[in-house]
């Protein structure tokens, strides 16, 4: 079940995530290859929050509105910001694990 998100929530997101042999850490935008540590790309803070939230809610459709509040809490952003975040996450992950559900949102495959 998805967490309720408000403008002031401090999300309980993991500090580290390994997906598709890539290592993401909440405290740095650098993405490393798992095991050898070589840098494979970067992911901004809001984009990492979106990724970690989708991971925590694997198998569930998460709306763009929720992802806006997760990544950019308290800031006025459009759905285009979410679209860019999903694009960048997919590019860095180099996999098809995040699917678009038309008129609903996004889901990370189990």
Where are these regions (language model features)?
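DNA-binding patch around the recognition helix
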Residues: 5-26, 31-35, 39-43, 82-110
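A broad structural signal for alpha-helix termini and local helix breaks/kinks
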Residues: 71-72, 93
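Glycine-centered flexibility sites
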Residues: 59, 74, 103-105
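Short, positively charged loop/turn segments that connect secondary-structure elements
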Residues: 72-82
């Amino acid at each position: 079940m998805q967490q309720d998100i408000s403008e002031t929530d401090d999300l309980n997101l993991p500090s580290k995530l390994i997906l598709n042999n890539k290592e993401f850490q909440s405290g740095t935008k650098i993405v490393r290859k798992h095991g050898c540590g070589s840098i494979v790309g970067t992911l901004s803070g809001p984009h990492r929050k979106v990724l970690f939230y989708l991971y925590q809610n694997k198998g569930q459709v998460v709306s763009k509105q929720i992802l806006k509040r997760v990544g950019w809490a308290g800031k006025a952003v459009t759905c285009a910001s979410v679209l860019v975040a999903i694009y960048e996450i997919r590019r860095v992950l180099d996999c098809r694990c995040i699917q678009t559900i038309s008129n609903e949102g996004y889901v990370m495959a189990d």
